[in-house]
Amino acid sequence: MDVSLTCGNKLLTTMKLEKAKVPTPRTILSFTEESALNSIETLGYPAVLKPVTGSWGRMVVQLKDKETAQAMLEMRGQMEGSLNQIYYVQEMVQRPPRDIRTIVAGDRIIAAIYRYAPDGDWRTNIARGGHGDICKVTSELEDVALRAAETVGGGLLGVDAMESPRGILVHEVNNTVEFKGAASVCSVDIASEIIDYVLKEARK
């Protein structure tokens, strides 16, 4: 399956990660508001409701209680488009106020950063005002990130992961890698590394 197709769809990404036994947050898919509410209560509050497609944390909401969940599900149910009728519900992972973005090129990690949420938000996207800090690549992070990248088809990818009591969990893999936040804190020249990788692949 095409890498961009897999990475552009959280459902496909999750299915591949779980099949390959790459650690990922507990996720339940539902196709009606009623079954989605049951899924949320199975995972427990708080939980996270995400769109199947999209980036930058858009339409990703934290469901703190049943009342909030019912309101968000009702709103989603009124939106047009078949993809909005797929309810992608994920556990709210107990983690520090950050996640990890690793930039993977083939079989190695170019760089890794912590991404911290901006004040008043829990989402860590740099595009939403979050900020980055350098992250040491541990053996666990390297193993999980490279396995995740290989699972979706490999290449130049951004693997997003969280630290949890169960270890490193991959929650997203991006085939369009934004590295402005990483470039501002990492000593490595990420742009040059990416160019070198692309040229090397083009010569094959």
Where are the model-predicted features located?
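Conserved N-proximal alpha/beta basic substrate-recognition cap immediately N-terminal to
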Residues: M1-R26
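Rossmann-like NAD(P)H-binding beta-loop-alpha module
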Residues: T24-P46
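Protein kinase-like catalytic core scaffold
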Residues: A47, Y88, I110-A111, L157, ...
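A short acidic, helix-capping loop that chelates divalent metal ions and anchors anionic groups
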Residues: W56-M59, G181-A182
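Phosphate-binding site of ATP-dependent enzymes
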Residues: R58-A149
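A short beta-strand motif that forms the metal-chelation/ATP-contact edge
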Residues: T102-V104, G167-G181
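A long amphipathic alpha-helix within ATP-dependent nucleotide-binding catalytic cores
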Residues: W122-V170, E193, Y197-R203
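Short, flexible active-site recognition loops that position polar ligands and cofactors
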Residues: F179-D189
